[in-house]
């Protein structure tokens, strides 16, 4: 682990690696003002939860760091863990197609996950894991400063919005995350299994486009 990360974590009052922690104390905020290189370094060397023991590599995020639209997913899968990039494979291809239909190339948006490491067997992340990782995403959102966020999947939407509402109730309306409009929709992997829901996701994309075009007061 880099000396800079030890300094940052020490300033935060946390150990370099805490394998078990109660969810109530799991959230750790990076110091304000950290830039892209520093946040990327913290993520790359992170040992704040047990996922560091099973990952191949971290998956920081990719795309336009000044994007108007930011896409937030759940966690890396096996292929993402191998390649170090979010949304690859069949789900990634479908996401790319969805974005293209909305007028965006993949490189024009910024794509990141709530979790930067893959949970074993693609299980849902624990409260501890999400609590440790969410501050990284929060800082990424601050740096990108998007005009809208598209949350894809139940876990991404619930973790970002701090709710346990099902995705079927979260989609179709505009939410707020620290002043940024958030639109929730189904995960591309779910749409591959349930193609009949693609129309709803297209409606969600149109909602996001409306926010980008006209703004929205949440």
Features from the language model and the residues they span:
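A polyanion-binding, active-site-adjacent surface
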Residues: 2-218
